[in-house]
Each structure stands twice: as C-alpha cells, then as structure tokens.
Amino acid sequence: HKEYRRQRQMCIRDRNGCTAVCEGANMPTTLEATKYLQEHGVIFAPGKAANAGGVATSALEMSQNSERLSWTFDEVDAKLKSIMINITHNMVDAAKRYGHEGDYVMGANIAGFEKVADAMMAQGIC
C-alpha cells in the first residue's frame, strides 16, 4: 500500500536524523506525513514557500524582458536570494504572530492570504 510505504519512509528518515524537509513539488506530502514531521520536530517547509524561487525567477525574467535589460547571473541570483529571504521572513513572522511559531505551513498560508487580501484592499475590491 502506497500510504504504508510513505509512512515507513518517514520513520526511516526520522531515525536517520532528518532535521528538515522541503517540499519539492505542489503538496506532495500527505497531511498525515506533514503532521508526523511537525510532531517529531522536523522543520517542514511547504512547497508554496520552498518552490517560490521558480515563480520568482520567471517574474524576474518577465521584468527584465519588459525593460529590455540583460542582468548577469549574479544580479539575478542576488534578486532571487532577496525574494526568498523575504518569503521566509513573512512565513516565519506570520506563524509567530498568530500563535503558531515554527509551523511554516500555517505561516505560509497566512502570509499568502495576507498578501492577496492586502492587494485586493488596495484595489478597492473589498
């Protein structure tokens, strides 16, 4: 059974000293596995935050193209690093602000919601 195999792999990782897991796709980790990791003190970075670099790099490319610029690898890398640090800070701060310190799934969800809600309010949509 797939779920049994997945849970077994989680136990093996835990016994081998795994301290952090970053999702590498859109929600590949089951809710049960996420809960297991969190309950066992494993830092869990959800895909919506951990994978934001791909979307951010696409946005940087579109910006570069629209302005007819040509950035070096180091320039793009510095901009991406700044974006990812900002995403991480927003995720961590949101989780802490709402009483879920260390729960990066909760933090990423809250921070994402706040960003969309703020944009909607700024546009007068709500």
Question: What are these language model-derived features?
Answer:
Residues 1-12:
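Single conserved hydrophobic/aromatic residue that forms the stacking wall/gate
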